[in-house]
Amino acid sequence: MEERSLCVSGGGAKAVTLLGLLYEIHARGQLDKVNIFSGCSAGAFICALYIVGINPIQQLKYFPQITDLKFDLSAFQIFIEKVGMNRIQKYTKKFRQVIEDKIGIQDPTLKEFYEATGKTFYISAVNTTKCKIIYFNHKDYPDIKLFDAIHASAALPGVFIPVKIKGSSFIDGGYYNSFPLEPLVDTDTIGVCFSKPVFDDGLFGEMLKIAKLHIYIAKKEAIKRHPNLELYECTSTFGLLDLDKTKMELLDEFNHGRQQHPQYYKQNA
């Protein structure tokens, strides 16, 4: 029997929609035998919380409400050492605390996280120093800190300062492919991601357009190469950086994600 895995894409604030869709998958018992996880950016946060026993609807409690993000549009020269104006660590204290409380280890390494949970966890990030994609995991990078890897995976250029790990600078894994299926090709995989990209208006949207096209094409190619993938796609009414939403708005978007599960309306008819 093949191993079961879950792949969750990135998406910034749109991850709330993914949580809703993932909740329906979880509620149907489809994730019961999953022991391998792969996540990018917001998807890495979702996977980490799920691994320690926090289901998708419970994860809404840990979704950050951020009203003070600053942007630097010149930061799309992404190979400069300091791009972005915010340290991502500032916004993840609640997330880090719950992980530490659940496994009883402060600032765990990837090896310690695996030993505490028994789950293999791949976290994608782009190494801009060496110009390559990295899939952090407990076998290849046992001594890397879990939170460093997750922060690196979500360090969106223009928003967050790149994360330094062992002398290299890392940015959001989505700048290569926001749907990290590559480590899972030999497993029976459930994948949760967004469908076609939505292009935003304005200068910031135009600057993201090429990146979004690349990410979409890379995702489609990764899907083609995976021999045993059960794919769930959705759309979101949120934008990538809509991180200042109220609790009611988050819940509405969560339910929007739930309704996109193929069986949702059949069950609730």
Residue ranges with predicted function:
Residues 1-40, 48-269:
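Patatin-like phospholipase
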